[in-house]
Amino acid sequence: SLIQFETLIMKVAKKSGMFWYSNYGCYCGWGGQGRPQDATDRCCFVHDCCYGKVTGCDPKMDVYSFSEENGDIVCGGDDPCKKEICECDRAAAICFRDNLTLYNDKKYWAFGAKNCPQEESEPC
């Protein structure tokens, strides 16, 4: 679920997904089009693609299980679909953490769809 995604971002990247990633570049936030603008935006693009491959459950609403082991997030549970959602969220949170030094809110916060032409979109 989106609430769990926020939790994973806080645990892994030590940032609020709502305040840092909900309206950034062309892909961080609801929907997405155009070219990813930087490494952080690419994290969101890959996350959107990952969600797009999930079938049989709702990535934004379904609750999954995870645990922390030696500082790492481990996705668990018996439902393979929910585990897949967790893996999408886990990978994005790690990507955000690994690209924190490249995050550029002055340039890409509230970037706007007008700067993300649909015709420049790339496939997943």
From Swiss-Prot:
Ca(2+) binds at residues 27, 29, 31, 48. PROSITE patterns: PA2_ASP, PA2_HIS. The active site is at residues 47, 89. Expressed by the venom gland. One of its GO terms (molecular function) is phospholipid binding. Keywords: Blood coagulation cascade inhibiting toxin, Calcium, Disulfide bond, Hemostasis impairing toxin, Hydrolase, Lipid degradation, Lipid metabolism, Metal-binding, Pharmaceutical, Platelet aggregation inhibiting toxin, Secreted, Toxin. It is an enzyme of class 3 (hydrolase). Its EC number is 3.1.1.4. Gene3D superfamilies: Phospholipase A2 domain (1.20.90.10). Binds 1 Ca(2+) ion. Monomer. PANTHER family: PHOSPHOLIPASE A2 FAMILY MEMBER, PHOSPHOLIPASE A2, MEMBRANE ASSOCIATED. This is Acidic phospholipase A2. It comes from Gloydius halys.
